[in-house]
UniProtKB/Swiss-Prot annotation:
GO terms for molecular function: structural constituent of carboxysome shell. This is Carboxysome assembly protein CsoS2. Residues 609-749 are annotated as: C-terminal domain. Interacts via its N-terminal repeats with RuBisCO. Interacts with the major shell protein CsoS1. Unlike H.neapolitanus and predictions for P.marinus strain MIT 9313, this protein is not thought to have ribosomal frameshifting. M-repeat repeats lie at residues 260-309, 320-369, 378-417, 431-480, 490-535, 541-599. Induction: Down-regulated with rising temperature (from 25 to 28 degrees Celsius) in both nitrate- and urea-grown cells (at protein level). Residues 48-78, 117-130, 264-276, 387-403, 432-444 have a biased composition (Low complexity). InterPro entries: CSOS2/2B (IPR020990). Residues 260-608 are annotated as: Middle region. Residues 641-651, 759-768 have a biased composition (Polar residues). Residues 1-15, 86-116, 709-720 have a biased composition (Basic and acidic residues). N-repeat repeats lie at residues 5-24, 86-105, 175-194, 213-235. It comes from Parasynechococcus marenigrum (strain WH8102).
Length: 780
């Protein structure tokens, strides 16, 4: 049966699958037409002998036991055989060889027709002998029922055959290129460890072509030696031999090498560095014209003239860069463009002063003119009034300029533009005038009044105008001879009932307005819009006093005298002196007695001791206080009222809420106490005085009567306000009569006898004790 190629087998298998389905895969996978082992694949790729089986493998693997499958019946046409994968076995064998020996085990080469034709004739007799040896005498009857499994084998050829079969590479002529290529190949194979390998000629040749023989390697080394010499003879890692110097003591000190960059000095004293072109003692033939003076650039240093000529050269060429001085002492370097003794025709204008940039130095002016003229500075220097230097364009006054005399001697506010230098003399003209109004207010600025040097503005000089006053008081005094009365103040000042100054538009009574007389001398509640000076001018002393008394006094710093523990000042505690004598707003915690004792004449306004000494005026009382006087003063200082007393000192506030004739709480709610009203408001005989005859009023119409509706100008029975029975009934916060409630049950404290108090101190100092034991606050 003829052997089929892989392509023909694939076509047959596909045809069988299309006709018989998957059942034909067993018959198609029969290995009778395709028998390939691992031993015949390697020669196929290398020797191109595809159809010839090898006679004997180079390395024989142990043969595994044969597994035979016996069919159930001899007549069965289907046989199950294990599938073989020779390609897979070849790949596994190749990978195993590469993992063991690296790339040297890879013997695959590119096949061509010449190699196949050359190896076909040699492989034919070998295949025939192999077939004869395989004949066992059974005629091949047992081959159908037995499957022989053999391990893949790999035939290894000698290294010499593989090297001889490879084409001989051409030697690299450029050693640098060979070194670079060898390094790159070594880095690609071995990584960074390849850089530590020696770089000798043999190593370079071996890395370039690993298949070189010893003879070829020696030829490559000789070729590199002929081109590069013996510099690569030693290895890179070798070191030079070291040891004691046998002739070290006999060796002389090494002479200093000549400086590459020398330093020399010119005839003018300047230092020049670079390559020295001077004359040397060790060189002959350059003695001519050494000490002669030449024109142009001097290449010889001053030390050459001092060594060989014993004198300094005379400079015949002028300096290329000269240094001159200006009239102000500044140094200027560059080309000198002044007058020269060797040039004629430049004498005119030598000693004349010019404006602009100064091109002539002060040295030439002193040489040809005898003295140098100082020109004007372009950048001036001055000092401020505080002594700080200022440079720049000077904007001050100059004696050569007229018209800048105005305001030269005045001190201005803001940035200082003039220095502290003395100003030149000139005509002082006032740029900013000073004047005064008729009311005495000073005004500064440009004067727009009448002047004696201007005609035509005499009309209306002495007339009075309304509005803003543009004419000063000096003009009126100079041209009119009399000073008119000033206009009314635009912003008035008034005094309130508490002696505070208020400025603004005045809304009080005026003598030039009629109809605002009613209510001038009446005390009003609320915010007063008319100042206290109106009452003083138009009303009597009693009316002013009534207005002052009518003004409510709010709680302030100097409160009433208090008993008990007071957080005041002047005690045994230190550190409370700061701010003790200053007026504060809010609840007063310091009594007037403590404030007067601690502060004295420094007490805030509103206290009795304001502006007075605490002990009074001198020689007004005894220096020694009697016991009776001390007891009276103690009774005055420590009254029977605890807390703040607003109106009277004989009322007790605090826990004594059920004492007879005692008022609890705020005393301003006394209108609900009927007993207090009957005792306080007893009918008295009023003294009726005949009213004086009032002058006839000039006001007619509405407001002609003395009664004014609206604001409470008159405290009458027909006017409602904030006090009286009607106010008490209208205010729901104040309790009314108790007729609609349950009768009040008297408590037991009113029936018991009051004990005599034996507690002194902060209990109120009353002669009767308290029956309350739980409420707290009765006893300190």
């Amino acid at each position: 049966m003829a052997r089929l190629s892989s392509r023909e087998l694939a076509l047959e298998r596909r045809k069988a699958l299309t006709t018989s389905g998957k059942k034909s895969s067993v018959a198609a996978g029969d290995g009778a037409n395709r028998v390939r082992t691992a031993s015949d694949v390697r020669p196929t790729r290398t020797d191109a002998a595809a159809a010839v089986e090898p006679t004997a493998p180079a390395v024989s693997a142990p043969v595994k036991p044969t597994v035979s499958f016996t069919p159930a019946s001899p007549s069965s046409s289907s046989h199950v055989k294990p599938q073989r994968h020779p390609s897979r076995d070849l790949v596994l064998a190749r990978r195993d060889a590469l993992s063991r020996r690296g790339k040297t085990a890879d013997t695959s080469r590119d096949r061509n027709r010449a190699d196949v034709a050359r190896q076909t004739q040699a492989a034919a007799p070998v295949a025939a002998s192999a077939e004869e040896q395989k004949t066992c005498g059974c005629g091949g009857k047992r081959a159908a029922g037995k499957v022989q499994l053999s391990a893949p084998t790999t035939s290894l050829k000698p290294r010499s055959d593989r090297r001889s079969a490879a084409p001989k590479r051409r030697a690299i002529e450029n050693p640098s290129r060979a070194l670079v290529l060898a390094r790159r190949e070594a880095m690609a194979k071995h990584g960074k460890t390849a850089g530590k390998q020696p770089t000798s000629a043999a190593a370079v040749a071996r890395q370039a072509n690993p298949d070189l023989t010893s003879r070829e390697l020696a030829q490559q080394v000789r070729e590199l030696r002929t081109k590069a010499g013996a510099r690569n003879k030693q290895s890179a890692g070798a070191t030079r031999p070291t040891g004691p110097n046998r002739h070290g003591a006999k060796q002389a000190a090494a002479a200093d090498a000549h400086w590459k960059v020398g330093e020399s000095t010119t005839s003018t004293g300047q230092t020049v560095t670079g390559t020295q072109a001077n004359r040397s003692v060790k060189t002959t033939g350059n003695e001519a014209s050494t000490c002669r003076s030449i024109t142009g650039t001097e290449y010889l240093g001053a030390e050459v003239f001092q060594t060989f000529c014993q004198q300094a050269p005379e400079p015949t060429t002028p300096a290329k860069v000269r240094v001159t001085a200006t009239s102000h002492g500044n140094r200027v370097t560059g080309n000198e463009v002044g007058r020269s003794e060797k040039v004629t025709g430049d004498e005119p204008g030598t000693c004349k002063s010019v404006t602009g940039t100064e091109y002539i130095s002060a040295n030439q002016s002193a040489a040809y003119c005898g003295s140098s003229q100082v020109s004007q500075r372009k950048v001036g220097h001055s000092l401020t009034q505080q002594g700080r230097p200022v440079s720049g364009v000077m904007v001050g006054r100059s004696s050569s300029v007229t018209g800048d005399e105005a305001g030269a001697g005045r001190s201005l506010t803001g940035d200082q533009y003039l220095g502290s230098d003395p100003l030149p003399d000139g005509r002082p003209a006032a740029k900013v005038g000073q004047s005064g109004t008729l009311s005495g207010t000073g005004v500064t600025g440009t004067l727009v009044g009448r002047s004696s040097q201007v005609t035509g503005n005499e009309f209306g000089s002495c007339h009075r105008v309304t509005g803003d006053q543009y004419i000063s008081a000096e003009q009126v005094n100079a041209f009119c001879g009399s000073k008119p009365e000033p206009e009314a103040a635009k912003v008035g000042f008034s005094i309130t009932n508490r002696n505070q100054v208020v400025s603004g538009t005045r809304t009080g009574r005026s003598e030039r307005v009629t109809g605002d007389e009613p209510g001038t001398c009446k005390a009003v509640t609320g915010t007063p819009y008319a100042g206290l000076e109106n009452a003083g001018q138009h009303c009597g002393t009693s009316a002013v006093q009534a207005i002052r008394e009518r003004t409510p006094v709010r709680l302030g710093t100097p409160s009433a005298a208090m008993t008990g523990i007071q957080p005041g000042v002047g005690g045994v505690m230190t550190g409370d002196e700061k701010g003790a004598c200053e007026a504060v707003t809010g609840t007063p915690y310091v009594g007037a007695d403590q404030l007067a004792t601690a502060c004295g004449n420094e007490a805030p306004a509103g206290t009795d001791s304001h502006g007075q000494a605490p002990e009074g005026a001198a020689w007004t009382r005894f220096s020694v206080m009697s016991p009776a006087r001390a007891a009276q003063q103690q009774r005055d200082d420590q009254g029977a009222v605890t807390g703040t007393s607003y109106e009277q000192g004989n009322r007790i506030t605090g826990p004594f809420d059920l004492a007879g004739g005692k008022v609890t709480g705020t005393e301003q709610f006394r209108f609900d106490n009927r007993e207090f009203q009957r005792r306080q408001f007893q009918p008295t005989v009023a003294v009726v005085s005949e009213p004086a005859e009032q002058p006839a009023s000039r006001v007619t119409g509405e407001g002609s009567s003395t009664k004014i509706t609206g604001d409470d100008w008159d405290r009458g029975e027909h006017v409602t306000g904030t006090e009286g029975v009607s106010a008490r009934r209208r205010n729901p916060t104040r309790p009314g009569p108790m007729s609609a409630t349950v009768p009040h049950e008297r408590k037991r404290n009113e029936e018991n006898e009051w004990p005599v108090s034996r507690v002194t101190g902060s209990s109120g100092n009353t002669e009767k004790g308290s029956l309350i034991t739980v409420s707290g606050g009765a006893r300190g």
